[in-house]
Amino acid sequence: MSRKPIIAGNWKMNKNPQEAKAFVEAVASKLPSTDLVDVAVAAPAVDLVTTIEAAKDSVLKVAAQNCYFENTGAFTGETSPKVLAEMGADYVVIGHSERRDYFHETDEDINKKAKAIFANGLTPIVCCGESLETYEAGKAVEFVGAQVSAALAGLSAEQVASLVLAYEPIWAIGTGKSATQDDAQNMCKAVRDVVAADFGQEVADKVRVQYGGSVKPENVKDYMACPDVDGALVGGASLEAGSFLALLDFLN
C-alpha cells in the first residue's frame, strides 16, 4: 500500500516569532506538491500564531509540540487542544521522550491527549522510543510495543489509520548517533505490527510511521528507502531552512 510520506521538523524550544516567520518565508514557496509529501513544522507555543499565519497560503502544515487533555479550565501553563484547532494548527506532537523524561508524562496521559486531539479535529503525531539500556538489553520491540498499545487504547480504527506514529530511539536523539537502516526498518515494522495486532492489518497498512533520531539530509534517503518508514521527525536539521529543504531531496 502506498502511504504518502510525512516530513516534520521539531524545533523544540528554539526560535522566537520573528525567526519562525523568516523560516516559513524561506521554505514555503520551495516545498513540493502535497500530492507527493506532507511537510510540517512543530513550533513552540509562543511561535504558533506567527507560524500558522506565515504558513497559511502555503502547503506547509503546522504542529504544536504538546497540548493538555482538557479544553479549558484551571490548568496553569497548559495548552488547550480546542484553542490549537481554532488557531489553525494541523497536528500535535505528543509523547516525545523529552516530555516523558523531563515532565514525567505517562502512557495514560498520552492516551488522554490523543483522544482530546481527535475530539478537536486535529491529528496526533504520537512518539515512542526506547533508551539505550532497553535497546542493548534486546527489549526494544517489547518496550515500544507497550507504549504504542497504551497510547492508542480506546481510539477507533479510523482514528488510528489517520494518525502518525514517530519511532525515535532515545539514544539517537540529538546525540549524533543514528539507528542503522536495518534498525529503523525493523522497529518501524514492529510499531506497525502492534497496530495490526490491536486494530487489524488494514489499519496498520494505512498508518504512517516516521523514524526520528539524528535524521539529516545525508541519511534521510536511506531511511526513506525502508518499506515501513513513511517519514521522519527531525530535530536539529529542521532549524535551518536550507537543511530542512534538503531533507526533501529523497523525493528525487
Swiss-Prot record:
Stored InterPro entries: Aldolase_TIM, TIM_sf, TrioseP_Isoase_bac/euk, Triosephosphate_isomerase, Triosephosphate_isomerase_AS
Pfam families from the UniProt entry: TIM
Active site residues per record: 96, 168
Biological process per Gene Ontology, one example term: glycerol catabolic process
Gene Ontology MF terms in the entry: triose-phosphate isomerase activity
Localization: Cytoplasm
Pathway per the UniProt entry: Carbohydrate biosynthesis; gluconeogenesis; Carbohydrate degradation; glycolysis; D-glyceraldehyde 3-phosphate from glycerone phosphate: step 1/1
Subunit structure: Homodimer.
UniProt record similarity statement: Belongs to the triosephosphate isomerase family.
Name under which the protein is recorded: Triosephosphate isomerase
Native source species: Streptococcus pyogenes serotype M5 (strain Manfredo)
Organism placement in taxonomy: Bacteria, Bacillati, Bacillota, Bacilli, Lactobacillales
